[in-house]
Structures are given as structure tokens and as C-alpha cells.
């Protein structure tokens, strides 16, 4: 059985998926499966993937579901994953040619793994350069949130143990289709560290129809998910300017949902009241 699942959630990205497919066909190790969860595409994605399955160049598992958003697709992917390791490669990203081999060799080289949830590595603009020239601020192991607290500002490739991911599914709300990834990953960070691997594993190509280009719209349409994100961030932060920002954002989403901030936000009454001016400014700026 393969050791790694390369998971790609997709929705009407037929035009870009061939790049990810060709990159997987170039892998120096074939010890993986490509799991595609199609979140309701109507652009012929399914027919194209079926043709690749018939080519039999790489093992592909395809699952179609009604459109429910990336987080539901991710939960489905984890539930379908048959391998020890799981990495999510978005449809506008692709693995470097030795990505699978590097992941498996690095993981197998680790002697103590019980405290590890997986591997954190770089995303880059090419196989030799990170997105903005950034480097990890420490070595060995650390939680992902710890890396960012210590000054890391770049993009990461995350490889998780499937058994751990399955215990931390993304919460879903019936009338929403998005929730920040950190809602699940922050919970994992509370219990586990990640092995730090200083190699570019995925090449990132942001596109105009991707989620990262529509953050304001995502915030407007998914207030419950964003409120949960800020609630968790407040729980994990101490007194700081950053904590104040989290509280201000949480106040905004409470107003949006017509909820009482004092009953929803895990902060003192004084902190919440102090964040009201910041919340008003966020609303004036169109950030809810």
C-alpha cells in the first residue's frame, strides 16, 4: 500500500489541473495516491480525471460531492485517505519532482515521532526559492503557530499523519462553505509539534479565481466560521496588540451575527469594551 496521499480539492478548475497531474507523473517516487475530491464541478473535470485514470500513469482516486466548500471537501478527503500520511496540494499548486520521495525519506529518517503531527516545509516560487526569501526561525520541531509567532511570514507545505487529522475535522456550518484552515490546525498545534523540513516541496501559483483573492467576500459570507477562528485565537494568545486585534475582529462578527460579544468572546469585559473602537474602524473599512 502507498504511504502518502496527495489530496487535491477542486471546484471548476479543469483548466489548471493538468499542471498538477503532470507534476505528479514526474515524481521520482510512485509511493503515493492522488485523491481528488471534486466539490461539485460542472466544467468537465470529472471526464478529464476519468481519462487520466484510464491512462494509468499514476494511481488516482476520484470522489464527487455536491458543492459544500473546501473544508467539507477536506473532511471527505481525510475520511477517504488510506495512507499513513496526507498532504493537501491545492489545484493551483504542484509538487516539485522529488516531492513525494523527499517527504517519505524525511519521515522515515525520524526516530521519535509520537510527539509529531507531521512535517512542515516550504512552498516556493520555484524549487530553489521560497515565496519571499523567508526561512524558518528555528530547527528541529515546532508547532506551525510557534513558527509564525517567532517571525516566520511565508507559505508552508503541511504533511500530516492521517490518524491525527481524522481526530480534528473542520467544523462545518449548514449555511456556510468556508472556515479558516487554522481552526483545525490550531487545535493540532496545542497537542503536537511538526518536524521542520527546510526544503521547497510545492510550487505556488496564486490565481484570480482562488480563495486567497476573495478574503473579504469569504468573511462576509461565512461569519460563523470566522468568529470561531477568532475565538480560538483569543484563547491561545496572551495580552498583546495581536490579541486586541483578535478581540476587535470577534466583536465585528458578533455584531454581524447579532450576538452578544460579552457572551461569545473568551476575553474579559474590559478587553471587549476596549476593542469596540477598533471594531468600529474595521466596519468602516469594510472588514465587517
Per-region residue spans from a language model:
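Conserved donor NDP-sugar-binding/catalytic core segment of glycosyltransferases
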Residues: 98-133
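Catalytic core of nucleotide-sugar-dependent glycosyltransferases
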Residues: 202-207, 214-240
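Glycine-rich, basic loop-to-helix element that forms the pyrophosphate-binding segment
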Residues: 65-81
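Conserved nucleotide-sugar donor-binding catalytic segment
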Residues: 125, 131-213
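Short, well-formed alpha-helical segments that are part of the catalytic scaffolds
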Residues: 12-26
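Short aromatic/hydrophobic "clamp" motif used to bind/position activated sugar donors
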Residues: 86
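A conserved acidic beta->alpha catalytic loop
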Residues: 23, 38-48, 90
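Short beta-strand/loop segment that forms part of the nucleotide-sugar
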Residues: 32-40, 61-66, 90-91
Amino acid at each position: 500500500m502507498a504511504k502518502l496521499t496527495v489530496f487535491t480539492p477542486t471546484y471548476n478548475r479543469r483548466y489548471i489541473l493538468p499542471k498538477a497531474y503532470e507534476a505528479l507523473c514526474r515524481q521520482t517516487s510512485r509511493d503515493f495516491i492522488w485523491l481528488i475530491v471534486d466539490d461539485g464541478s460542472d466544467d468537465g473535470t470529472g471526464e478529464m480525471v476519468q481519462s487520466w485514470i484510464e491512462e494509468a500513469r499514476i494511481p488516482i482516486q476520484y470522489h464527487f460531492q455536491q458543492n459544500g466548500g473546501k473544508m467539507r471537501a477536506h473532511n471527505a478527503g481525510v475520511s477517504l485517505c488510506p495512507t499513513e500520511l496526507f498532504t493537501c496540494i491545492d489545484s493551483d499548486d504542484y509538487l516539485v519532482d522529488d516531492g513525494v520521495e523527499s517527504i517519505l525519506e524525511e519521515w522515515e529518517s525520524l526516530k521519535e515521532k509520537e510527539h509529531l503531527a507531521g512535517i512542515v516545509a516550504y512552498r516556493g516560487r520555484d524549487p530553489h526559492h521560497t515565496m519571499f526569501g523567508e526561512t524558518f526561525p528555528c530547527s528541529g520541531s515546532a508547532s506551525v503557530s510557534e513558527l509564525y509567532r517567532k517571525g516566520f511570514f511565508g507559505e508552508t507545505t503541511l504533511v500530516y499523519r492521517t490518524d491525527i487529522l481524522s481526530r480534528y475535522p473542520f467544523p462545518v456550518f449548514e449555511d456556510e462553505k468556508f472556515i479558516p484552515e487554522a481552526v483545525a490546525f490550531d487545535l493540532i498545534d496545542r497537542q503536537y509539534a511538526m518536524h521542520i523540513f527546510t526544503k521547497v516541496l510545492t510550487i505556488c501559483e496564486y490565481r484570480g479565481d482562488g480563495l486567497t483573492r476573495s478574503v473579504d467576500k469569504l468573511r462576509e459570507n461565512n461569519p460563523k466560521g470566522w468568529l470561531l477562528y477568532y475565538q480560538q485565537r483569543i484563547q491561545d494568545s496572551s495580552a498583546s496588540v495581536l490579541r486586541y486585534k483578535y478581540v476587535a475582529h470577534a466583536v465585528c462578527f458578533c455584531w454581524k451575527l447579532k450576538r452578544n460579544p460579552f457572551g461569545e468572546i473568551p476575553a474579559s469585559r474590559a478587553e471587549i469594551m476596549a476593542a469596540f473602537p477598533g471594531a468600529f474602524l474595521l466596519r468602516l473599512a469594510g472588514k465587517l
